[in-house]
Regions:
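An alpha-helical, amphipathic repeat domain used for nucleic-acid recognition
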Residues: 1-164
């Protein structure tokens, strides 16, 4: 439900939608919510959304593919899937976008991120490294096996590696 405003929104819902899309890609649901929040009438928002889709400026499929491509550099597929669901992208579209990410690319992203998260910290044991860096990778949506592989790469061959 749109919030009450003291004055009507400036410009058309279509123009406002174009400005939003010019800043970054949005899902259809996000555009709809933002336009309603800015006080545009429901009918104008629906017409603007339909026109943006018709002109090719708005579409959940394109949004999902771009979103996955951008976020997969720093997040695992589990987190990205949850984010797409929160943006109301349908499951089939989200799964198609997520399927395009190569497993090797996820492993490389986790390795790069693990190096960045560890920084210059010297860990006393592999378990400590796994506890601190591995846990952060898990929170970012990487699977356990990928987080462990990234941590093992950081640790590289010390005797405690066998403990894990």
């Amino acid at each position: 439900m749109p919030r009450k405003r003291s004055k009507p929104p400036e410009g058309s819902a279509f123009d406002a939608g174009l400005r939003l899309i010019a800043m970054r890609d949005h899902s259809s649901w996000e555009i709809r919510q933002k336009l309603l929040k800015r006080g545009h009438p429901e009918a104008d928002v629906a017409a603007a959304e339909a026109r943006l889709i018709e002109m090719g400026f708005l579409g959940d499929r394109g949004f999902a593919f771009q979103y996955v491509r951008r976020r997969s550099r720093t997040h695992g597929l589990l987190a990205i899937s949850a984010e797409l669901a929160a943006k109301r992208v349908d499951r089939e579209t989200a799964e198609a976008a997520l399927a395009r990410v190569e497993p090797h690319a996820q492993v490389l992203a986790a390795h790069r991120l693990a190096h960045r998260l560890a920084g210059n910290t010297e860990f006393g044991s592999y378990r400590e490294l796994l506890h601190k860096v591995g846990a952060r990778l898990l929170r970012r949506g990487f699977p356990m096996d990928v987080a462990r592989a990234a941590c093992k790469d950081l640790w590289r061959g010390t005797p405690e590696e066998a403990e894990a």
